[in-house]
Amino acid sequence: MQQSPTAGKIINCKAAVAWQPAAPLSIENVQVFPPRVHEVRIKIVNSGVCHTDAYTLSGKDPEGLFPVILGHEGAGIVESVGPQVTTVQVGDPVIALYTPECKTCKFCKSGKTNLCGRIRTTQGKGLMPDGTSRFSCNGNTLLHFMGCSTFSEYTVVADISVVAIERLAPLDSVCLLGCGITTGYGAATITADIKEGDSVAVFGLGSVGLAVIQGAVKKRAGRIFGIDVNPEKKNWAMSFGATDFINPNDLQSPIQDVLIHETDGGLDWTFDCTGNVHVMRSALEACHKGWGQSIVIGVAAAGQEISTRPFQLVTGRVWRGCAFGGVKGRSQLPDLVKEYLDHKLEIDKYITHRRPLKEINEAFTDMHNGNCIKTVLSIP
C-alpha cells in the first residue's frame, strides 16, 4: 500500500472552529493527529452546509458540545490509514458517513435498520471510538462532530464511517450525498419504498424535501404534492417532479383537510422535512385511513413532542421515522454515486451557492435565505 509523505505525522491545516454556541465560526490553524487503529485520515476537498450544523451552532441542540469542528456532508481523498484498516486505501476518493456501518453489531446484522450501534456512544460525545480527539488548536482539544468534522482541510474518522467511491465522481457534487440528498431520496425509495401510482405529500421543500420528490418520481408515484409556506419553492418543487404545490398560508382550511379532499380520503405517503411538530401532526392526519404512512425526517427542537388523537393510529395510520433515509452508507451509498454518474440521480441542480471555506459564515447566512437550496464549500 502506498504511503503519504505526511503519514504518521501531525498535520497543521485550516479549519472552521465553533468555539462556543451562537457565535460565528472562526478560521483557525489546527493540528490533526495521525489515525489510530481502525481510523482513517481524509483530506477534505468539498463539504456541504446543512441545517443540522446550524442547529448545533445555534446552541439549541441539547447534545451540542463545544469547542468543535462542525460539518458532516463532505468528500475527500484518503491521506493515511491507521493499523488494521482494510476497507479503504491511501488515495481513495471517499465520502464521510455520519451514520456508520460496522456490519457486525446487532443493528447491522438485524437487516431491519441502518442505525449502526458500534460507535454511537463516543460519537455522541464528540470523540473517536477510543474516547479521545484527533484535533487540537492552541493547546485546546477540539471535539469531532457527528463522526465527520468536514469543515477542516483534514479530518480523522472511524473506518466504519467512510466509504470509497468511484474515482470519476466529482467531489464537489457527490459530497452532498453525505447527508441531505441521500436522506430525502432514501426516505422515498428505501424507507417508504413507494409503489407505482402511490400518492405522496412532502412538507418542507429544502434540499431534503426536494430529494423526497426526486425519489418519489423515481418510484413512479402518482400525484406528488409539494407543500411549503415559501411561494418561491413552487418552481423548485415542479422542476423536481411534483404534480401539485400548496402554500398552507393560502388556505382557509387546515392543510390536512385540503389534502384529504384532494386525494379522495388521504395520501398513501407523507413526509415531514420541517422539524416542526405541528406540521408532523398535519402530515400524519393527511394520511389515508387504513394504510397511510407518514415518515418523519425533520429533527425537532429540544423538548418538542409529537401528538395526535390515538384514533388516528387505531384507524390504521402509521407514524415512522428515518435517519439518512434508511441508507446503509458502506453498502448502498456507492450505488447512489453510480446513479449520479449514470445521469439517473440529480445532484447539481440542488447547488445554488459555492463558497470557499473562509466564507463559511456567509454560507450559514445563505442557508437561511429562501433562494438557497445547497451551498458547497471548497476546502481550503
From Swiss-Prot:
It comes from the Eukaryota. It catalyses: a primary alcohol + NAD(+) = an aldehyde + NADH + H(+); a secondary alcohol + NAD(+) = a ketone + NADH + H(+); S-(hydroxymethyl)glutathione + NADP(+) = S-formylglutathione + NADPH + H(+); S-(hydroxymethyl)glutathione + NAD(+) = S-formylglutathione + NADH + H(+). Its EC number is 1.1.1.284, 1.1.1.1, 1.1.1.-. It comes from Schizosaccharomyces pombe (strain 972 / ATCC 24843) (Fission yeast). PANTHER family: ALCOHOL DEHYDROGENASE, ALCOHOL DEHYDROGENASE CLASS-3. GO terms for biological process: amino acid catabolic process to alcohol via Ehrlich pathway; formaldehyde catabolic process. Gene3D superfamilies: Medium-chain alcohol dehydrogenases, catalytic domain, NAD(P)-binding Rossmann-like Domain. NAD(+) binds at H51, G204, L205, G206, S207, V208, G209, D228, I297, G298, V299. GO terms for cellular component: cytosol; mitochondrion; nucleus. Its cofactor is Zn(2+). Zn(2+) 2 binds at C102, C105, C108, C116. GO terms for molecular function: alcohol dehydrogenase (NAD+) activity; hydroxymethylfurfural reductase (NADH) activity; S-(hydroxymethyl)glutathione dehydrogenase (NAD+) activity; S-(hydroxymethyl)glutathione dehydrogenase (NADP+) activity; S-(hydroxymethyl)glutathione dehydrogenase [NAD(P)+] activity; S-nitrosoglutathione reductase (NADH) activity; zinc ion binding. Binds 2 Zn(2+) ions per subunit. Oxidizes long-chain alcohols and, in the presence of glutathione, is able to oxidize formaldehyde. Also acts as a S-nitroso-glutathione reductase by catalyzing the NADH-dependent reduction of S-nitrosoglutathione, thereby regulating protein S-nitrosylation. Pfam families: ADH_N, ADH_zinc_N. Keywords: Metal-binding, NAD, Oxidoreductase, Zinc. Belongs to the zinc-containing alcohol dehydrogenase family. Class-III subfamily. This is Putative S-(hydroxymethyl)glutathione dehydrogenase 2. Zn(2+) 1 binds at C50, H72, E73, C179.
